């Protein structure tokens, strides 16, 4: 086989024409558009970290998703590979595709076994083609079982633009980036089938997140992207803007997928209202503390019932800093609960909730461990792909040397065998790189759920804060009643009554009334948050099982499918070089 005329036909003219291409071997990794150079194989442009790999590979197409992406044929000669997709397509348009050609396509095992599980109904509804499990997870992280399967909402973030802040100063305002947010939906709350776009800056997203956190206490609200001030200074501007665009799109899609948040007025205003965002901006901590310090003297001296917690504010946590006296009272109540000898008037007695809370904590630790192992796996696969690429390039250089020095057919035969081995190694490297990109996308589910664990902890913190408010108000009422009784007893001893004490008694009674109303509102808020926690934990448990099952299916399909592809590549090389084993045995 190796001594055949075809083997001898490893034309030196073609090889000489490609000598310069060997150093920069054009083996398009992503479909032929990006050549694989020695620097790529050595890992100069690769990402070693799992998190950085996620951002750079987020747009790579899922190999499980039909239809397959046409790429450079894996069975083609790497020395003669076309430099672009158009060259490849034109070179194959004039001849039939044989069954022996091995494309970088969805693994055959995956097509046969698991092809139904990776269907993206959302993309079919919206007329778009986005079949990656990563996008599916982002869109379905919080699915509503009660919503109709025909309902959809698709949000895209695109077209970042730099704009100038309006300023009256001579220097001028700062520049900032705005993003075009386009929404396509048929939800009745958004006016039925419609499409609309607005431009928003990152500060608007922060305002939206703050408003949702205040309004929907007890819900597991997906965390917003971080400000990333350091990264904005270190990273390239274009890369940073693109990374933020992707993060904002994922965040808004998660919000729109939440069964409650998707119908919120805040999200509707954010997505629909043109111009400046009409939602009130969040007040910074320093301003809130300053407001609290201004009110503190009146609260301490009890002027006009100022020490009472307003009913309008009892629904929000005291840690915001606007009411320092309430903050001090709840801090004292918290210390009393932990270190005091007396039992608080209301305690957390929901054993089922306490068990779920402990399980969530354990789950978070398990996800952290699994995420670390996933990062190690990605790094190992990346190293294997780079090593295979280096091996292939080394054999290509050796092939070049053998052909330059060849004076007889056996030398050319050996050179041809080395070329086949180099081809197999480079194809295996390409398979490893593609496998790694899909592994990142599938196992990215672990990182997504780490973010959701933060949201769960925030929902539980809302419950604890609401309970602490109830405990503080219940403890304060007996104290106020005792003060009134003492003042009434002292006033009764004075003939005609003590006017100052009578006025103080009236103020305390007004404070008691306000505190009683605040207590009732706080109890209702606490019960509402408890119900929100219960429904959210049930929803997350249900969705986690489905998401983790999809993650494992996709991971296994890719591992088996690409192992099958690489096995076929090496089996072909073993068959082509089997004559050496026969010669060794015969000798």
From Swiss-Prot:
Observed phenotype of the null mutant: Reduced rosette size and inflorescence length as well as root gravitropism defects in snx2a and snx2b double mutant. Accumulation of storage protein globulin 12S in dry seeds.
Domain BAR: from-to ranges: 331-586
Polar residues biased stretches: 42-59, 123-134
Native source organism of the sequence: Arabidopsis thaliana (Mouse-ear cress)
Record protein name field: Sorting nexin 2A
Topology versus the membrane: Peripheral membrane protein
GO MF annotation terms: phosphatidylinositol binding
Binding-site positions, a 1,2-diacyl-sn-glycero-3-phospho-(1D-myo-inositol-3-phosphate): 201, 227, 244
Low complexity composition bias: residue spans: 135-150
Family of the protein in this entry: Belongs to the sorting nexin family.
Tissue specificity annotation: Ubiquitously expressed but at a lower level in flowers, siliques, and senescing leaves.
Superkingdom of origin organism: Eukaryota
Disulfides per UniProt: none
Main localization category: cytoplasm
GO biological process: developmental process; protein maturation; protein transport; seedling development
Subunit structure: Homodimer. Heterodimer with SNX1 or SNX2A. Component of the retromer complex which consists of VPS29 (MAG1), VPS26 (VPS26A or VPS26B), VPS35 (VPS35A or VPS35B or VPS35C), VPS5/17 (SNX1 or SNX2A or SNX2B).
Disordered: annotated span: 1-78, 115-151
Cited SMART domains: PX
Residue list for modification Phosphoserine: 144
Role played: Plays a role in vesicular protein sorting. Acts at the crossroads between the secretory and endocytic pathways. Is involved in the endosome to vacuole protein transport and, as component of the membrane-associated retromer complex, is also involved in endosome-to-Golgi retrograde transport. Also involved in the efficient sorting of seed storage protein globulin 12S.
Record note on domains: The PX domain binds phosphatidylinositol 3-phosphate which is necessary for peripheral membrane localization.
Location in or out of the cell: Cytoplasm; Endosome membrane; Prevacuolar compartment membrane; Golgi apparatus, trans-Golgi network membrane
One GO CC term, this protein: Golgi apparatus
Key words, A-Z: Cytoplasm, Endosome, Golgi apparatus, Lipid-binding, Membrane, Phosphoprotein, Protein transport, Transport
Domain (PX) ranges: 157-277
